[in-house]
Amino acid sequence: MNRIHAVILDWAGTTVDFGSFAPTQIFVEAFRQAFDVEITLAEARVPMGLGKWQHIEALGKLPAVDARWQAKFGRSMSAADIDAIYAAFMPLQIAKVVDFSSPIAGVIDTIAALRAEGIKIGSCSGYPRAVMERLVPAAAEHGYRPDHWVATDDLAAGGRPGPWMALQNVIALGIDAVAHCVKVDDAAPGISEGLNAGMWTVGLAVSGNEFGATWDAYQTMSKEDVAVRREHAASKLYAAGAHYVVDSLADLPEVIAHINARLAQGERP
């Protein structure tokens, strides 16, 4: 049948951890612990969506971070430096990720609605397997149980922005065509992942990394501040190539209905 058969969902900022705070704060702590180098939370957010080693590498290439590194060590960050920061990052992230495992508002109901339509739920993450092995059962205790999940270090080909994790979900879920899949993510590398896999892509402008607010802060934010942050996030996600941008996963069923109508007319991603 010419309709959406599966959605492939990101984790932090998409289905759990409103604002994607679990990984960002840990990057700040890992830089400090490994080398006593300060980075800001805003800087930590810039490469979000990549695998965590690649994320650290990208942070080291940010001009402001590189300038601080050069001032302290007289050189740019090396692969060995990245390894050391990653080694500090991993135990911190494994210890903290369970604290950020609660599903974002609307996720459980949305998943139930999608499954009622016969849609399978795949997922993938920039987290490595060691972190996912803590996060997945913790999220399950809160009621979120995707049909499949893939970690960023599971596949020899690599992670985002390549298509491989998304395509591994297609294989595992037995989906007949990538055009019948939707990749949902709150960060640009995850949108690129979906596009590279030949899928429809939906960006989340409020629940995730680009908006960058806690749920409590979002609830008390002025309409003007919400609008400014939403526009900032949406512009980045559209620039990455997202077919649609909505606030959160709660808005996905309406988007899927729209995509199904386009598929019925013979359109493809």
UniProtKB/Swiss-Prot annotation:
GO molecular function, one term: magnesium ion binding
Biological process annotations from GO: DNA repair; organic phosphonate catabolic process
Cofactor field: Mg(2+)
Cellular component terms per the entry's GO annotation: cytosol
Domain of life: Bacteria
Record key words, sorted: Hydrolase, Magnesium, Metal-binding, Schiff base
Recorded catalytic activity of this chain's protein: phosphonoacetaldehyde + H2O = acetaldehyde + phosphate + H(+)
Role: Involved in phosphonate degradation.
Family classification: Belongs to the HAD-like hydrolase superfamily. PhnX family.
Subunit structure: Homodimer.
Name the record gives this protein: Phosphonoacetaldehyde hydrolase
Organism (species): Salmonella paratyphi B (strain ATCC BAA-1250 / SPB7)
